[in-house]
A protein has these predicted regions:
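Hydrophobic helix-and-loop "lid/oligomerization" segment in the mid-to-C-terminal part
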Residues: 18-19, 29-35, 39-156, 178-179, ...
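Short beta-alpha junctions and helix-cap segments that line functional grooves
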Residues: 144-147, 168-172, 185-187, 391-394, ...
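Short gly/pro/ser/thr-enriched loop/turn and capping motifs at secondary-structure boundaries
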Residues: 137-139, 168, 188-193, 207-209, ...
């Protein structure tokens, strides 16, 4: 479901240039407003919520079903996935004959969740699979021949690769040569020539017509497990009738949120139902991590994406890559708490390292590019940076300078491992592939919004020039024409917990289903102050005296933060997202400030 394109020329609240140099526009054109009004009148949906739905492409007839998605109505027949039947049959054979199975996963949240899903399923039928997660630094992404040979030597007669393997020709051939079957379950792009596998289930195969290419790996694994369970039931396997697959949706939801796949169709149902499963705290590992993260209130996508995901990822970034999958497979609460404690420690270490690296990266970027205006691509590089954190740096730099950004970590030999993040409208992956073809990179690839690369230090200057020439014109045009789409206007008195609850029902929000942005027009900035060293806390006051608290995260040094800090007592327009904050056990409304402009 695509979000409607901006077709409205008139600036919302007449904001032509905001603090973040954006033009504010209404998300809805006249046809969209008419659709929202009809939706509200026909289905008795609050008008503001109807505007949110209409602004995200939901039709009038689909509104009620959208607000209550079900797995049953949105899940396709798993056999529509190419090779799903073959994969299910091979898994059933392994279960029926008690084979030694190994699971090879990726080192991110989706990889950990996919590995845990497969492990829990097979363990229910009495198998004890071995999980192998490669080291990010020493082994890199995906199966490698040495690891596959080792798993075969350990006795594995079947290796299931999850969230990887679609292009691992040499590694899968090594497993085949060792007499071990391989089943690949993945969602990454696939080449025209497939690696040697018993089954390769990937909705992004050219010959796959399932239409499920937007699923993360855990979402694909779940469909394979549905098919496998059906086959086991057909064969009257007694244990098959005691397994509730829906109870595993908490892990699927975690992966779906953290892998930032579009929250549409089956993905949205996965998250809605997975959040319900997560609130029961039946997964000892998730429960321990929620406790360690200080979760307050019901589990939300925010908790998955910003509290749980970073902690699981910390293991893969700077510590033991297998910690995340181990945590999600464990049933012993005391053991889960030990692993959760270690992941929390690693996350704090990662945060400290990131803070130092970010300060260095921003200083370099400011020296090289000033405020970034006019630059096509921000490229920063250091020798002492941790390669597991450069992706986070690139994301921060992209947000700070509003331009595509790369962070590159060089090792003592002069080889640099880099990661990049792009802005909407600029295809970073294509630019990186062009640099590979130009001989400037050892290797590189990616997609429109993110890319990875390996470069020799001797080519860094040439690479900067190549990127600048490739991107400057397009990027500066994109920045100059940047707009912020506003879903509607609310006053301080209208920002209520009831509104927050209604907005949550229209969620979850994420990629492909963006969080609603509301404008709070012409309110007096009653109070503004720094929170810590980076965040800006504000209190807005309406003419009737009602107030609304807000916070602009990591904005202190940015133009938005500087504007707010110097606008006390003035009337301003503020744009942001509305949510609930838990303070001393009490829920209260809080505006997450994204932009602002002075009111006439």
């Amino acid at each position: 479901m695509m979000e409607p394109a901006d077709t409205v020329a008139r600036a919302f609240l007449s904001v032509e240039r905001s603090a973040t140099e954006q033009r504010w526009v209404s998300r809805l054109d006249q046809a969209g407003q008419n659709r929202a009004l009809a939706m509200s009148q026909i289905h008795a949906i609050p008008e503001l919520i109807a505007r949110v739905l209409a602004g995200r492409g939901v039709g009038v007839d689909d509104a009620l079903a959208f607000l209550d998605p079900t797995i049953r109505s949105l899940m396709p027949d798993p056999h529509m996935l190419t090779d799903c039947e073959k994969a299910a049959e091979r898994l059933v054979r392994a279960i029926e004959t008690g084979e030694k199975v190994a699971i090879f996963g990726d080192y991110d949240v989706d990889g950990a969740a996919s590995s845990a899903l497969m492990y829990r399923f097979l363990a229910h039928f009495g198998l004890t699979p071995e999980i192998y997660i490669p080291d990010r630094i020493f082994e890199g992404y995906g199966p490698n021949p040495a690891a596959m040979q080792q798993l075969a030597a350990n006795g594995a007669t079947l290796i299931v690769t999850v969230d990887c393997g679609s292009t691992s020709h040499e590694s899968l051939q090594a497993a085949k040569d060792a007499g071990t079957d391989v089943v690949v379950i993945d969602h990454h792009q696939v080449g025209t020539e497939l690696p040697p596998a018993v089954a390769l289930v990937n909705p992004n195969r050219e010959d796959d017509l399932s239409g499920q290419g937007h699923l993360c790996a855990a979402g694909v694994v779940f469909l394979v497990l549905v098919a496998t369970l059906r086959l086991l039931k057909d064969r009257r396997n007694r244990q098959a009738f005691t397994l509730d697959l829906l109870s595993l949706l908490d892990i699927v939801a975690l992966a779906t949120v953290c892998d930032v796949v579009p929250l549409k169709g089956l993905n949205r149902a996965y998250v809605v139902k997975g959040l319900i499963a997560a609130r029961h705290m039946n997964n000892a590992g998730l429960a321990a991590l929620f406790k360690k993260a200080g979760l307050g209130g019901p589990v939300t996508p925010y908790h998955f994406g910003f509290l749980i995901g970073p902690r699981i990822n910390a293991g893969g970034r700077i510590g033991d890559a297998a910690l995340g999958s181990r945590l999600l497979t464990i049933d012993d609460s005391s053991q889960a708490e030990v692993i959760a404690e270690r992941l929390d420690e690693l996350n704090r270490e990662r945060q400290a390292m990131e803070a130092v690296m970010l300060a260095e990266a921003e200083a370099e970027a400011l020296f090289e590019y000033g405020d970034g205006s006019g630059a096509g691509v921000i490229v920063t590089a250091r020798e002492n940076w941790h390669p597991g954190i450069v992706g986070l740096l690139a994301s921060r730099l992209k947000d700070r300078f509003r331009r595509p950004a790369f962070a590159i970590a060089f090792d003592p030999s002069g080889k640099g491992t880099g990661s990049g993040r792009s802005i909407n409208g600029f295809d970073m992956g294509r630019m990186v592939r062009a640099a590979v073809e130009a001989g400037l990179l050892v290797k590189g690839g990616g997609h429109a919004m993110a890319a990875g690369l390996t470069v020799e230090r001797a080519n860094l200057g040439k690479l900067r020039t190549f990127f600048e020439e490739a991107a400057a014109k397009t990027v500066n045009e994109l920045v100059e024409s940047s707009v912020l789409k506003i879903d509607g206007a609310i006053g301080a008195s209208g920002a209520t917990l009831q509104l927050v609850d209604q907005l949550e029902q229209a969620g979850p929000y994420g990629s492909g289903h963006s969080q609603p942005i509301f404008a709070v027009p012409a309110h007096r900035l009653r109070d503004v102050r720094l929170v810590g060293t980076a965040h800006v806390k504000i209190t807005l006051e309406a003419m009737d005296g009602s107030r609304l608290d807000g916070i602009a995260f990591r904005a202190a040094e940015a133009p938005l933060g500087q504007m707010l800090l110097n606008a006390r007592g003035r009337n301003i327009h503020v744009a942001g997202t509305v949510g609930a904050d838990l303070w001393q056990g009490q829920r209260r409304v809080q505006l997450r400030v994204l932009d602002a402009a002075f009111a006439p």
